[in-house]
Structures are given as structure tokens and as C-alpha cells.
């Protein structure tokens, strides 16, 4: 795909909060509750998921129980996004020194190499104020090699 085939008006969310035992030492976010289906109740009777290969999701990811800190996984995700023609990823971000903060620079570098832009969704942290949001934005600009 050529760079001019990317649509910069088309954004996708990217949740880099998944961890696995091999990369991160433990499972992370794979065993969250499955949200109720909005129109098909047959999906609402699924058992609880303990994590591991039996993950908390209706569909098993093609790349398996991956880590969001794995270079190969991030590269594959960014390539999938590029093949779809999506020009911007929006990172879900919970703030400085969080699990989701560890891989921001890596994601941005891989996305930049593919000419994909990155924006941030500042998740609703506890006791968030306008001043804290300003500090979060300043941190992103200072630490992510913003382009």
C-alpha cells in the first residue's frame, strides 16, 4: 500500500493493555468480564474466563494470547491497520508509569515508519482535573518523541 492510500480521516482505537506470561510475567487484561451482547442474548450466558488461553472475549484473537509489549505483535497490528487504509491510531492511555505507558514510544516508532499517525485517548483517571490533564499532555509531548 502506498502512503497516499492511508486515510487520515479514518481512526481506530488501539488498546495496548494486554500482557502474557511469556513477555510480561503474568496475564494482563485477558480475563476481564465479557460485556453483555446488545442484541443476541445467547452470548450473555458465557462462563467466567480464568485467563490463559481461555480469554475473556467472545472471539479469540488471530495472534493468540499476545502481549502489547511484544515488538512482533505491535508490528503485525500496525501492518494490519495500514492494510486497512487507516491513517490514525488512537492509543488508550491511563497516564505516566502505567502498564499502557511502557510501550508508547515503541508503538509510535513503528506507526511512524508506516506513516500512520498517533493520537491519544486520555482515559478517565481518578480525581482528574484540568491541571492533571495539562500535565498528562505535557508528559506525552516530552516523552513520546512527538512528531
Give the location of each predicted region.
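Glycan-processing catalytic domains of CAZymes
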Residues: 1-147
